[in-house]
A protein has these predicted regions:
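Glycine-rich SAM-binding Motif I of class I
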Residues: 93-97
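A short SAM/SAH-binding and catalytic strip from SAM-dependent methyltransferases
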Residues: 145-157
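S-adenosyl-L-methionine
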Residues: 1-81, 112, 116-142
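C-terminal substrate-binding/active-site "lid" region of AdoMet-derived donor-dependent transferases
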Residues: 154-226
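Conserved class I S-adenosyl-L-methionine
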Residues: 82-91
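Rossmann-like AdoMet/SAM-dependent catalytic core
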Residues: 207-251
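Conserved SAM-binding motif I beta-strand of class I
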Residues: 105-110
């Protein structure tokens, strides 16, 4: 059988060896945007057509990634990255590809770059943009760039370690794409360093699955927020930060829990 054409193949195409899913093939078949008239972003097209379909988000994640970047979010990252981007946890490099198409110098890293079989989300997938092997230890060598972290894992410490190491090495700009405190991306310490958790929830409220954030300084100040196209039940967004060179201490105890923890 003839292999389905990948969505957007005539605008820059699929990774080598990848065929289109049924959802992609449908979106390509009735895509009203003439070739060459709009920036290449097949995930945005797929999201518009696939909302509400069973398994659509899971298929989109496996091929592209967790976040659905729109023009506003891409414009924010471009504007926030005058010296280029270093992306950590880049997955299949879809967002890196979109930024590179817009003229941004992007260096993308992942601890287990696809198609590595040890990558639990993207095993066997060819990347859209070159993704190098690397963890939070590489960011200290890229401080002139903007650090980009998209949907970091909630049950690991590397996201917090990365934003802390980048700050201490002199990095000045950060873009985070994901959910807020209590959401499904980034642990409590990560969000505390970004100023999103005013008090240690583990010690103050006895939240059993919370990470102790006592003494965690606020290293980053949020400057801008852009809403993203969201899958049903998810609340991710793009946030731009600048480094605080006199880190603020944790704030006073809030009167109630500011959020409830959600499942991935």
């Amino acid at each position: 059988d003839e292999r389905r054409r990948c969505l957007g193949a005539d605008r820059g195409g699929c990774p080598p060896g990848r065929s289109a899913s049924p959802l992609e093939a449908e979106a390509e078949a009735d895509d009203p945007v003439p070739v060459g008239r709009a920036p290449w972003n097949p995930l945005l097209d797929l999201h518009r057509r696939a909302q509400g379909r069973a398994g659509a988000r899971e298929q989109a994640i496996a091929r592209y990634g967790f976040a659905v970047p729109n023009d506003e979010a891409l414009d924010l990252i471009v504007a926030w990255s005058p010296e280029g981007v270093v992306e950590l946890g880049a997955g299949v490099g879809y967002l890196a590809r979109l930024l590179a198409d817009r003229g941004v110098d992007v260096v993308a890293y992942d601890k287990d770059p696809p198609p590595s079989a040890t990558n639990r989300w993207f095993a066997g997938r060819e990347p859209w943009h070159p993704v190098l092997p690397g963890d939070e230890g590489v960011v200290g060598e890229q401080t002139q760039r903007t650090l980009l972290i998209v949907w970091p894992t909630r049950d690991e410490t590397w996201p917090a370690d990365a934003v802390e190491a980048f700050h201490h090495a002199g990095g000045g700009r950060l873009v985070y794409v994901g959910e807020g405190p209590g959401g499904r991306s980034g642990d409590d310490r990560f969000h505390a360093l970004l100023g999103g958790i005013p008090r240690c929830l583990a010690c103050t409220y006895g939240v059993a699955d919370a990470v102790c954030t006592c003494g965690a300084p606020v290293l980053w100040r949020r400057e801008r927020t852009v809403e993203l196209p969201q899958w049903h039940g998810y609340t991710d967004r793009a946030e731009a930060y600048t480094a605080t060179r006199q880190p603020a201490p944790a704030g006073r105890r809030p009167s109630r829990l500011p959020w409830r923890r959600r499942r991935l």
